[in-house]
């Protein structure tokens, strides 16, 4: 097949995307596909023309325009199948506050939070218990995440994000173990337990070779593993996602599971989580990529 691989872009995760593209290109060639790579940072105006001549597109862009539904909408308009979530599902998952509202509606536990699209007054109080995570409302890989323990730290962290033009999400920190679980189609993968070297699983820990200890399958009781997988599937379906997604959680000592967010374009680098979970199920990296391609074609035909 002729495949359009879209990688790079202009988000803070650009380099991760480009590194992953090399691995995915090799996997596609192994299955006999012909790959055309475009980087929207330089080739955005070529996407429509090239996509019309392809059998399928593979989106490997984090943030805009890959995870916010823009490329998905373009590809749908020209009739080119692509892997993963629809434009609506992509945008809902990327907008953390919107996703959390739907999770709560479906009875999925998620930490208490406050969404701030604009900078509040100096006298404003968050109404949350410290410590608090201060996050960019739109973004992934734990970029622009700060853990604060008091009011002064809170405003410094918020100021930095607002000055960068970001919307802010405040979230009560849950004390527990970090776990993550991928979903492919209607099947949850073996969860991973993450023991980070820092205070939390931030951008450095996620992509550095020795940044965190990631144990797969997670060494947890069978009923806990099943619960994590069920939650990941429910989150996937709540956002009406297709293809592959990855849900991130905090598991408290009392076994309460808190859903943090869902990623619609999980990392596909050498150290990424979903490829490791797929490997635990017996899927090689090329097999995983091929499965996502076949799902893209199937979903397009529905």
Swiss-Prot record:
Cofactor annotation: Mg(2+); Mn(2+)
Enzyme superclass (EC): ligase
Binding site for Mg(2+) 2: 261, 263
Protein name per the record: D-alanine--D-alanine ligase
MF terms (GO), sorted A to Z: ATP binding; D-alanine-D-alanine ligase activity; metal ion binding
Family, similarity comment: Belongs to the D-alanine--D-alanine ligase family.
Enzyme Commission number(s) of this protein: 6.3.2.4
HAMAP family: Dala_Dala_lig (MF_00047)
Entry-linked Pfam families: Dala_Dala_lig_C, Dala_Dala_lig_N
Co-factor binding comment: Binds 2 magnesium or manganese ions per subunit.
Main location group: cytoplasm
InterPro entries for this protein: ATP-grasp, ATP_grasp_subdomain_1, D-Ala_lig_Van_CS, D_ala_D_ala, Dala_Dala_lig_C, Dala_Dala_lig_N, PreATP-grasp_dom_sf
Location(s), subcellular: Cytoplasm
Binding site for ATP: 127-180
Matching PROSITE patterns: ATP_GRASP, DALA_DALA_LIGASE_1, DALA_DALA_LIGASE_2
Described function: Cell wall formation.
Highest taxon in the source lineage: Bacteria
One Gene Ontology term, aspect cellular component: cytoplasm
Annotated metabolic or biological route of this protein: Cell wall biogenesis; peptidoglycan biosynthesis
Biological process terms in GO annotation: cell wall organization; peptidoglycan biosynthetic process; regulation of cell shape
């Amino acid at each position: 097949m002729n495949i359009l691989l879209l990688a790079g872009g202009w988000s803070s995760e650009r380099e991760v995307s480009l590194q992953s593209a090399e691995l995915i290109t090799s996997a596609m060639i192994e299955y006999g596909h012909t790959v055309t790579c475009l980087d929207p940072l330089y080739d955005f105006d070529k996407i429509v023309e090239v996509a019309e001549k392809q059998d399928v597109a593979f989106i490997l862009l984090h943030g805009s325009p890959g995870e916010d539904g823009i490329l998905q909408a373009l590809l749908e308009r020209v009739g080119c199948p692509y892997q993963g979530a629809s434009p609506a599902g992509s945008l809902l998952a990327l907008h953390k506050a919107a996703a959390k509202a739907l999770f709560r509606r479906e009875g999925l536990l998620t930490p208490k939070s406050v969404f701030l699209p604009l900078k509040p007054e100096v006298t404003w109080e968050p109404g949350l218990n410290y410590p608090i995570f201060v996050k960019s409302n739109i973004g992934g890989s734990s970029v622009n995440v700060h853990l604060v323990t008091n009011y002064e730290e809170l405003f410094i962290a918020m100021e930095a994000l607002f000055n960068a033009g970001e919307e802010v999400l405040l979230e009560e920190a849950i004390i527990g173990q970090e776990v993550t679980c991928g979903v492919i189609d209607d099947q949850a993968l073996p969860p991973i337990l993450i023991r980070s070297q820092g205070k939390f699983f931030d951008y450095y820990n996620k992509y550095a070779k020795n940044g965190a200890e990631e144990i797969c399958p997670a060494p947890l009781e069978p009923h806990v593993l099943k619960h994590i997988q069920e939650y990941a599937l429910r989150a996937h379906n709540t956002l009406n996602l297709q293809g592959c997604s990855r849900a991130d959680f905090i598991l408290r000592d009392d076994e309460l599971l808190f859903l943090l967010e869902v990623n619609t374009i999980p990392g596909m680098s050498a150290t990424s989580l979903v490829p490791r979970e797929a490997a635990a199920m017996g899927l090689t990296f090329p097999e995983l990529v091929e499965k996502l391609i076949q799902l893209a074609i199937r979903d397009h035909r529905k």
